[in-house]
Amino acid sequence: MKNLYVLLGALSLTVAALVLFATRNTGRAESAHVESGSTAFIKSPIVMKGDKYCGTDDRPATIAAQEDDRAVKLKQRSALGLTADQNVTGGVVNVYFHVLTDGTNGDLRQSDIDSQIRVLNNAYAPWGWAFNLASVDRTVNVDWFNDCYSNERAMKNALHQGSAQDLNIYSCVPGPYLGYSTFPSSYRRQPGLDGVVILYSSLPDGSETNYNEGDTATHEIGHWFGLYHTFQGGCSKKGDYVDDTPAERSPAFECPVGRDTCTGIRYPGLDPIENFMDYTYDSCMFQFTSGQDARMDEMFTLYRAGQ
């Protein structure tokens, strides 16, 4: 959030998890993987832990390290005579969709996945981004499905496809979260872990009440593009490193119209509860800002384009 004073916050954003299981793939590449989990540790479909809807790693130390690295890269580009005018300004992102299931739960129809892609395209099209469903694969693995957050490394090492420019989406039960994502700067160190994980029931018309319009994926992909939560840093100076998102002291839940947690002349504007990077209901969020768009372009240019 860019206003005037937004502290480097502490919430966690790391990798996005959801369970997307495609039953049928029409006209697209599709493969099937069958893995057997040694034990079936079934977790209840809890979607939050306290007030943590998103499991992406946004601890202050993580954010500070990422911003330091970003500053170095920007300095390097400046030395080469490159400016923001030469950043990528949108494009087509190929999507590799990995549907996980325990053999009974997590099954997604092709139409479910197609609906999710439409939601993403509607959200990002105003900013020049489009998502192309490159392939769908299905994996039967009890352990991975029931807790893809804890089993992330094994799952992703087996299923990840593409390059830094390509988006891997995993649908499953991501521990206690609705979803989580990696940030662009982590690709260089751990390319195989790059991607977004979402709760399988958060897709459009899924069973996750108030979070079943597909915007868990929209939110987590925002992280994949390099965005932070709108409430990152609270009412302090740097906030979410975006100039046109009003400062917000803490995450907003449900749809609290008129909420204003950072008050005074230094903090114009109400809390951005309608922003995709807050924690409100899917029905409440519907936009990114021009500043967020500029950051997405910059981060894609620095960390994903041509990688």
Each language-model region and where it sits:
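Second-shell loop/turn segments in exported
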Residues: 100-109, 206-211, 283-284
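Propeptide-to-catalytic entry region of secreted or membrane-anchored zinc metalloproteases
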Residues: 25-167, 171-175, 301-306
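Metalloprotease/metallohydrolase-associated module, dominated by Zn2+-dependent proteases
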Residues: 244-307
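Metzincin-family zinc-dependent endopeptidase catalytic domain
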Residues: 114-254, 258-259
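Short glycine/proline-enriched loop/turn "hinge" motifs that connect secondary-structure elements
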Residues: 85-90, 188-190, 267-270
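Solvent-exposed, acidic/flexible segments
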Residues: 106-113, 210-215, 270, 289, ...
